Amino acid sequence: MLMKVKLTITESRCRSGYFKAGDEFIVEDLCPPLCHELWHAIYPYVCVLQNGGDLDYGETRASCFDARCPDGGRVVIHGEAEK
């Protein structure tokens, strides 16, 4: 069974107005209602966390990440494995 991953929008200047800061999504077995560009950018991190892995940041490892939308970084999202 896959672990749940919580995604939180921490900043938003989304050109399409899809997101606002504080929006939260729980990822289980289906992708959340994110635009495909943002989902494509974060999916590898989400997949690692869903499968119980940690992300390697060189000197540290963590069960969370922060990422920016590929559209000029207009949206910032934080993801973390739910315990």
Regions found by a protein language model. Give the residues of each.
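Short, compositionally biased
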Residues: E37-G53
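A short beta-strand micro-motif
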Residues: V5-E11
